[in-house]
Amino acid sequence: APPIQRGHWGYDFALQLVRASVTRFHRIQGVDGFENITDPKTPTIVVANHQNGLMDPLVLVSLVNNSQVHWLTRADIFYKKLTRTILFSFNQMPIYRQRDRLSDARERNAKIFEICAERLRIGARMGLFPEGNHRAMKSLRPLRRGVSDMVNASLKLDPSMRQLQILPVGIDYEEMPSFRR
C-alpha cells in the first residue's frame, strides 16, 4: 500500500509549475461553485468528466487551493519503478481496469478502495474520473462503478463517515488541441 505523503516538497514544487503552466497556456473561464468546496478536513471525493488525458487532473489540481487531491490512476503506468515512486510521492494510487485483463483485478481494486476509505477517514480528498478513459467528446460517457465502490468501502470502514461528500466537476474545453500564446 502506498504511504500518504504529507507536505512533500516535490508535490509542492510540481504544483507551482502546474499552476503557472495551466494559467499560461489555458484561459480558465466560467469557474462556478467554488463556494461549495468544503473545509479541507471534510472527506471528499472529487468526480469529474475526462476529456483530455493528463490535462484534466492538472487543471483540477491547479484550482483546488487548500488541499491535495489523491488521484486514482490507471494501473499500467505504475509498472515502472521510477514512475511508480513518483506517482506514490504525489499520493496517486493504481486502479485496475477490465482491459488490464488481470484475473484478480477486483481483489486488487477492493484493497485500493480500502486504502481510499482510510485516507478519506482522515480527511483526504480523493479524485477519480468515473468514465474510466478519456476522449475529446462534449458529452458524458457511461460511468464505471468506482465512486460507489469507494463510498461503500468508506462506510464499511467507518459508518460515521456520513459526512463524506461527492464533489461533481464538469470540465469543458473550448479548444482542446490549441494552447494560448
Could you tell me what each predicted segment is?
Residues R6-R181:
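Soluble catalytic domains of membrane acyltransferases
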Residues A1-P3:
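Short, contiguous pre-domain boundary segments
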